[in-house]
Curated annotation (Swiss-Prot):
Subcellular location: Cytoplasm
Gene that encodes the chain: ino1
Protein name stated in the entry: Inositol-3-phosphate synthase
Native organism: Dictyostelium discoideum (Social amoeba)
Catalytic activity: D-glucose 6-phosphate = 1D-myo-inositol 3-phosphate
Single GO MF descriptor: inositol-3-phosphate synthase activity
Family indicated by similarity: Belongs to the myo-inositol 1-phosphate synthase family.
Amino acid sequence: MSAQMFESFKVNSPNVKYTDEHIISDYTYQTTKVQNVNGELIVEPVDQKYIFKTERKVPRMGVMIVGLCGNNGTTVVGGVIANREGLCWNTKQGLQTPNYFGSVVMSSTIRMGMDENGCDAYIPLKNLIPMVHPNDIVFGGWDINNANLADAMQRAQVFDYDLQVQLIPHMKNITPLPSIYFPDFIAANQKDRANNVLTGTKKEQMEQIRKDIRDFKESNKLDTVVVMWSANTERFSSLVPGVNDTIENLMAAIDRSEEEISPSTLFAVASILENTTYINGSPQNTFVPAVVDLAIQHNVSIGGDDFKTGQTKIKSVLTDYLVSAGIKPVSIVSYNHLGNNDGKNLSAPQQFRSKEITKSNVVDDMIASNNILYKQGEHPDHVIVIKYVPYVGDSKRAMDEYTSQIFMGGHNTIVLHNTCEDSLLAAPIILDLVILAEVTSRITMKKQDDDQFATFHPVLSLLSYLLKAPIVPKHATVVNALFKQRACIENIFKACVGIAPDNNMLLEQRL
């Protein structure tokens, strides 16, 4: 039976109400509570009634990218311009048309149910609840290099030449704002690019970033702004008592230009103080405890860490499959080489260490889920190597070897080779992150007996699907398994319109 595709839908239920301003849904959340009682697992099914309220008006949104003139920044902006203007270009494969492939928001569908003939019905994810369209986003941002976006796009060598020629008139007048540059935090080989930097104390530079955000919002008549870090990977910041452990200590440390206050931390603090969502697309520990506490205090959304594009996304799928199948991965070896500026920066040991940490942790929750395969504290050998090879440019090569124990002492080895067009994979993820972060700000919910609606926790774990090392609220579970992360997005948005999660039981076809 073939699937049916629809662009829109109507929910026929007394539990869903559409007003001019809101979608209001009465939703029964079914979950399971467990207790360990004297070594016995007691399982209790729980039904909890919630009310979801989603604002229908889509705001005029701007995105400010830190690292605007990098490969990711130019690819995002150029890709959106090509889609908005309908630019087509020729390659040796023929005429190419713009699209948003690789975006879960723009190019994926969700199953809504089954008709009387057993045919599944799907709609685009972007049509489930009102969302910002990428074509309507206003872009700006900062960079330590002063190249205009047309020159930076040509330097990146990501787009085909014919498309670059058509984009130049649209991008040549876009220039980056001066950015924060502390040489100690990124590789020394980035110094020759740093010709567009702020000066002054750390407090003065942070205040300038705040002013930039305000000016950008006002000059473009925006309702909301998201700040996205897509700049160089920084080294990890040391967690120092009296410096970045509490809000008060952090603000005082900024006032005295403390050495361990990184550029990304200053951008995060500036964004939070301007009531602006901040997302960290690189692996460094921007979100030190004081920054997280500041976001919670101001109820400003933050998300991170590190875009999940090629190799890591496959790793989270493959490891989940192996462990779920009762197969025991005992060795995971991942090798990468790339030639873009990200690879150049990561060739420095301290910056590589930041990346190594986020890429290593991606299998942890899957390993911990199966104590039949793994004893307490047992973990696969997991090695990550990244090398800089200038000639391959943005075309990152990833090679992985998975060795697993199977039945009766046997071994299975899986070897993968993955050519990742790095920025072409990252750009749609950047769009997904900012669109999903915005839409969550328009969703409030409450338990049926509560008086007040509440927003999502400021630490946006909902974005985990798109990030290598997702940050979550304190004491919350970190989920890295990819399909669980995808189901979370889908099912929360379904709850907003009163639709049950897709449990795949298909009981109507089992009898």
